[in-house]
């Protein structure tokens, strides 16, 4: 039986996009820096609009929609049927975004079909992240990108990503994160290497310490201005990307 609680994602409905008391509001706040970083990687690698992108564990499309709105052909997959139903219902007209229920360990997608694969805030939610990286490498084309975001296994990450989440979002389910499933950058690099991926960058990510954060702490609700920024050292979360050889 899995130690991590992934079941609640299927039942969020429109809370994916509304409300400030549930932990998913932090995912909404975090989506901005994920999209920003993904676009930076795409620009660096020459992956332009029209490229095919697979968003693994996409939820209700918090990252998929902004990318599709910029002209990327995005397919989102997630094991949570309710999240996929919400994503389909929320898909804006005129954007190339499709969604399907699929397992991150075996997506069912053709080998080498995607210019980029996104593993954003999901590797710490699975028991076998190495197998997810292997599947990402399988469906990425040679020279394609695998973009990731996850949490380091440090005391700071334990404090902020587990206990801090409960402080700023009063409606946080139990076991949203499990400390033992957090991944050190060195471990991720080793797993990626075994999967045939060359990690090119790891960059720290942390909350912005400002009035919005303290407002959230005091009221135990996520302020609309709650933001994340990059950090020199990946002591809490980190983003990065790898290239398929």
Language-model-derived ranges and their functions:
Residues 147-169:
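Conserved class I S-adenosyl-L-methionine
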Residues 62-106:
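Class I SAM-dependent methyltransferase SAM/SAH-binding core
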Residues 1-20:
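N-terminal, positively charged/glycine-rich alpha-helical extensions of SAM-dependent methyltransferases
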């Amino acid at each position: 039986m899995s130690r991590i609680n992934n079941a609640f994602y299927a039942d969020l409905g429109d809370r994916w996009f509304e409300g400030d008391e549930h932990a998913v509001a932090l995912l909404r706040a975090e989506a901005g820096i994920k999209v920003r970083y993904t676009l930076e990687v795409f620009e660096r690698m020459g992956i332009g609009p029209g490229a095919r992108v697979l968003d693994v564990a996409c939820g209700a499309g918090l990252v998929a929609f902004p990318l599709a709105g910029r002209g990327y052909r995005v397919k989102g997959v997630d094991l949570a049927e309710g999240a996929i139903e919400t994503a389909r219902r929320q898909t804006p007209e005129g954007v190339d975004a499709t969604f399907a229920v699929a397992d991150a360990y075996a997506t069912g997608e053709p080998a080498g079909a995607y210019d980029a694969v996104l593993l954003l805030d999901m590797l710490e939610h699975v028991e076998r992240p190495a197998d997810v990286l292997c599947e990402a490498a399988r469906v990425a084309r040679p020279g394609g990108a695998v973009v990731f975001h996850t949490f380091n296994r440090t005391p700071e990450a334990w404090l902020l990503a587990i206990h801090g989440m409960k402080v700023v979002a009063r409606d946080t389910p139990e076991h949203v994160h499990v400390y033992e499933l957090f991944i050190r950058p060195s471990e991720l690099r080793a797993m990626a290497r075994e999967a045939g991926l060359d990690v090119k960058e790891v960059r720290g990510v942390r909350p912005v310490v400002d009035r919005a954060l303290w407002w959230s702490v005091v009221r135990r609700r996520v302020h609309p201005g709650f933001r994340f920024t990059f950090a020199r050292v990946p002591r809490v979360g980190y983003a990065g990307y790898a290239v398929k050889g």
